[in-house]
Design a protein with these regions (language model features):
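Short, Lys/Arg-enriched N-terminal segment that forms or immediately precedes the first helix
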Residues: 10-24
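Non-DNA-binding regulatory cores of transcription-related proteins
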Residues: 76-162
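DNA-recognition alpha helix
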Residues: 46-60
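Basic amphipathic alpha-helical segments that dock to polyanions
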Residues: 67-77
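Short helix-capping/hinge SLiMs at alpha-helix to coil transitions
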Residues: 23-25, 39-42, 57-58
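Short helix-coil-helix linker/hinge
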Residues: 27-30
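Pre-recognition alpha-helix immediately N-terminal to the DNA-recognition helix
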Residues: 32-37
Length: 162
């Protein structure tokens, strides 16, 4: 969510607070700060990158262990996702959504600029993957799918904007 307007950021953070409250949890100031940094980032961030950004914007240093605990909390609350391939984090693109999403999360990762798009897979696509696994005797468990490629912006840059 790069170049996010302050009003949109505030709205998403309010939605995150409501979501936490519905789950009997609190979005504390530090949790809010970590989530805000992830929402404003144009690419996935490691825990130490989050720590660095948080410590730049405050006078009291946040310990690294706190960032790890906060990221774990935010992941449990379904507000952020950890990308398995890079061990980095992105904010959930569906924080303010009021509709259902499939259990498995799907990400399109750009190899050029490191941008990440969270996408909804169709039920048909999920069923096709389950059927493919079933033919070789594997029962799939819900998990996220990470696919790498080149985004439109990078494709246009590589071809000289043509």
């Amino acid at each position: 969510m790069p170049n996010i307007k302050q009003s949109k950021l505030d709205s998403l953070l309010r939605a995150a607070e409501v979501s936490c409250a519905e789950n009997g949890a609190r979005l504390t100031q530090r949790r809010r700060q970590v989530l805000s940094e992830l929402m404003q980032s144009s690419s996935p961030l490691s825990a130490y990158e989050v720590l660095d950004l948080c410590n730049r914007s405050t006078t009291s240093a946040m310990p690294a262990m706190s960032v790890y605990r906060i990221l774990d909390f935010l992941e449990q609350q379904l507000l952020v996702h950890r990308l398995s391939t890079s061990n980095k984090y992105v904010s959930c693109a569906h924080i303010a959504c009021d509709h259902k999403h499939f259990q498995a999360t799907h990400f399109l990762l750009c190899e050029g600029c490191s941008s990440v798009e969270e996408v909804d897979a169709t039920e048909e696509a999920s069923e096709a993957l389950e059927q493919m696994a079933k033919t070789v005797g594997v029962k799939l468990t819900p998990q996220q799918v990470e696919l790498s490629g080149i985004c439109t912006t990078c494709q246009n840059s590589a071809s000289g904007g043509v």
